[in-house]
Amino acid sequence: MMKVKVAINGYGTIGKRVADAVSLQDDMEVVGVTKTRPDFEAKLGAKRYPLYVAKPENVELFERAGIEIQGTIEDLLPKADIVVDCSPNKVGAENKAKYYEKAGIKAIFQGGEKKDVAEVSFNALANYDEAVGKSYVRVVSCNTTGLTRLIYMLKTNFSIGRIRATMLRRVVDPKEDKKGLVNGIMPDPVAIPSHHGPDVKTVLPDVDIVTTAFKLPTTLMHVHSLCVEMREAVKAEDVVSALSEEPRIMLISAEDGFTSTAKVIEFARELRLRYDLYENIVWRESIGVDGNDLFVTQAVHQEAIVVPENIDAIRAMFELAEKEESIRKTNESLGIGKVF
């Protein structure tokens, strides 16, 4: 079987993880990655993958730094069947207009891009089939991925009504040193809704959801607190049972020491490379029912949760596998599933 040739444009927080995940699959391979600047990530990336320069005008910088490059993004794209764009917010749309459309290449974009950059916004559990055969797909953001997975499982197993979700957002990724929030809690935005609810509706258009969001001075994970109106009587144990059937949702317990996101990440450091958590991390004790309202609290590792979604999007776009088969293969390759 011919493997799908994948280019990664942007070998950063998401890009390097997607590259490594692609390398674990038996039906796709990395043909090259790009960097804009000759920094330490570029030096390490060049040791693992063919390295190309994302901005052709920066070639001389790489040469002066002594980093071996194979060319520019314009040299890479003809060697690939698809490009996974992991550029900063809004740069993906620029790359589409400047490079991808001209090269006639399929492309996957990340959640920082506007929805109209692609033909479909994607989550493997919720709408895999909508991406089948498409040329441009947008994998929704880390927060939206976490919300969508959980809501999809709830609406698949129960009759649900209005959803209210509060997003407690990490302020920046751990490596960022140019911005942040050292002391304070920032409503983001102050007015409702935050963008997360409308973004969920790009994947699950029939969901009634409103979200608010706050930035907190932490870098480890996001936390979501959901209140879901249930249209039928339900017990907490029924929800626990339903969620436990989905490998991409990990149920944890405070009784086991998971008392904060710090403890969750410490667990992840023992579990996987780069302490990556691809799953929604749901506190079992947080699942509770009060009248018609279901409450759930989950944590989302923003650096990793979208990685399996990118892999499944590639399979859908090239019609390599049906939904269940793709998700199974991705889960097995990344070690997603029962941990305890």
UniProtKB/Swiss-Prot annotation:
Q: Which HAMAP family match?
A: G3P_dehdrog_arch (MF_00559)
The record's subcellular location field reads: Cytoplasm
Recorded catalytic activity of this chain's protein? D-glyceraldehyde 3-phosphate + phosphate + NADP(+) = (2R)-3-phospho-glyceroyl phosphate + NADPH + H(+); D-glyceraldehyde 3-phosphate + phosphate + NAD(+) = (2R)-3-phospho-glyceroyl phosphate + NADH + H(+)
Recorded protein name is Glyceraldehyde-3-phosphate dehydrogenase
Q: What is its EC number?
A: 1.2.1.59
- Broad enzyme group: oxidoreductase
The source organism is: Archaeoglobus fulgidus (strain ATCC 49558 / DSM 4304 / JCM 9628 / NBRC 100126 / VC-16)
Sequence similarity: Belongs to the glyceraldehyde-3-phosphate dehydrogenase family.
Metabolic or biological pathway = Carbohydrate degradation; glycolysis; pyruvate from D-glyceraldehyde 3-phosphate: step 1/5
Give the active-site positions.
C142 (nucleophile)
